[in-house]
Amino acid sequence: LECQILKKLIVSNANILIACSKETGEIVFGSKTRYHILKNGIDLDSFMYSEKLRTKSREDFNLTDKFVVGTIARFSKVKNYPFLINSFEMVLKNKENAMLLLVGDGEEKEEILAMVKQKGIEKNVIFVGHTNEVTKYLHIMDVFVLPSFTEGLSLVTVEAQVSGLPCVVSTGLPDEILLTDKIQKYPLSDGFSKWANYILESKKYTVRKNNIEVIRKQ
């Protein structure tokens, strides 16, 4: 109730209303309210793909011959980490050399650590914690996965696409996130098994390349 009152006060008193995506604008301001879309800015050159960086980074983590599934997100309920863990568990049953790279911190981290241990897959899951080296970890990954319940405009998903990564994300992300032909959106209602297949199918994208020019034209 307090949130609804606050929304009405903001909409009625603001000179300009700005949202990072159409879907976010409709959620926050309502579909009948006029607002402007201002997409988040990113230094695209910082995420340019480098084969040299990928090789070195994977060697540093002893992941040269591994299939690395990864995400970069805060450990919070909205990011839906349990769904990712359950989906990865099924990936692992089909691909023994699979590894899960989790980059981030947050209030749900201990719960996810316990979940991984309970499933007995801790040898296949790497927790990195907070980092400013996002580019390095995107280069390590073979596929980026984000099963969030909802997102405004996920910057890290844009960054993953710049670096040429295949991306498997939920329909909780807005359509504005679809910037290359290597990203697919799926409903969470498809379940863990189908999501595991979506992740495994991403292996068909065997060639990594920069997508800077493609994304700049968006």
Over which residues does each language-model region extend?
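A conserved, positively charged/aromatic
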Residues: L1-I18, E26-F29
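Carbohydrate-associated surface elements
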Residues: E23, G41
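Nucleotide-activated donor-binding/catalytic signature segment of Leloir-type glycosyltransferases, i.e.
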Residues: L113-G129
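Short hydrophobic beta-strand element within catalytic cores of glycosyltransferases
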Residues: P166-S170
